[in-house]
Amino acid sequence: MTVVGAVLPELKLYGDPTFIVSTALATRDFQDVHHDRDKAVAQGSKDIFVNILTDTGLVQRYVTDWAGPSALIKSIGLRLGVPWYAYDTVTFSGEVTAVNDGLITVKVVGRNTLGDHVTATVELSMRDS
């Protein structure tokens, strides 16, 4: 599991409007582009879209679901790409890229129909059980 080149199982998540609005509100992000389709379109967007706080949480969930309850996230470096609009699915994939002195590095990519939505590097360690 924690060897360089280990591939994480894919995770597919569908972003319906309820998911997008509820995760924006749960992260206290009240920007209208995340919950008001008319205002998002008026600002040049195709539809409402997922916020970066949700993306960060989903990247963390993806890695910890794979690593298990002993995982301790040390850092997440994240870059956004194309938007994740309502009614699209993001597929998360990942690979272990380094293991050094108990620190595991995982590259994560979330892709949707428009391309790479999020690219992240996650560093984690495993707590002693």
Swiss-Prot record:
Catalytic activity: 3-oxochola-4,17-dien-22-oyl-CoA + H2O = 17-hydroxy-3-oxochol-4-en-22-oyl-CoA; (2E)-octenoyl-CoA + H2O = 3-hydroxyoctanoyl-CoA; (2E)-decenoyl-CoA + H2O = 3-hydroxydecanoyl-CoA
Activation/inhibition comment: In the absence of the Ltp2 aldolase, ChsH1/ChsH2 can hydrate only about 30% of the 3-OPDC-CoA substrate. Complete turnover requires the presence of Ltp2.
Pathway in which this enzyme or protein is active: Steroid metabolism; cholesterol degradation
GO biological process: cholesterol catabolic process
Gene3D superfamilies attached to this UniProt entry: Hotdog Thioesterase
Effect of residue 29 to A: Retains 2-4% of activity. Still forms heterotetramers
Origin superkingdom: Bacteria
Enzyme Commission (EC) number: 4.2.1.-
Top class in the EC scheme: lyase
Assigned keywords, A-Z: Cholesterol metabolism, Lipid metabolism, Lyase, Steroid metabolism, Sterol metabolism
Any one GO molecular function term: lyase activity
Function per UniProt: Involved in cholesterol side chain degradation. Catalyzes the hydration of 3-oxo-4,17-pregnadiene-20-carboxyl-CoA (3-OPDC-CoA) to form 17-hydroxy-3-oxo-4-pregnene-20-carboxyl-CoA (17-HOPC-CoA), in the modified beta-oxidation pathway for cholesterol side chain degradation. Can also use octenoyl-CoA and decenoyl-CoA, with lower efficiency.
Family: Belongs to the thioester dehydratase family.
Subunit (UniProt): Heterodimer composed of ChsH1 and ChsH2. Two heterodimers combine to form a heterotetramer. The complex interacts with Ltp2 via the DUF35 C-terminal region of ChsH2. The ChsH1-ChsH2-Ltp2 protein complex is composed of two protomers that form a heterohexameric structure through the Ltp2 dimerization interface.
Name of the protein this chain belongs to: 3-oxo-4,17-pregnadiene-20-carboxyl-CoA hydratase beta subunit
UniProt lineage: Bacteria, Bacillati, Actinomycetota, Actinomycetes, Mycobacteriales
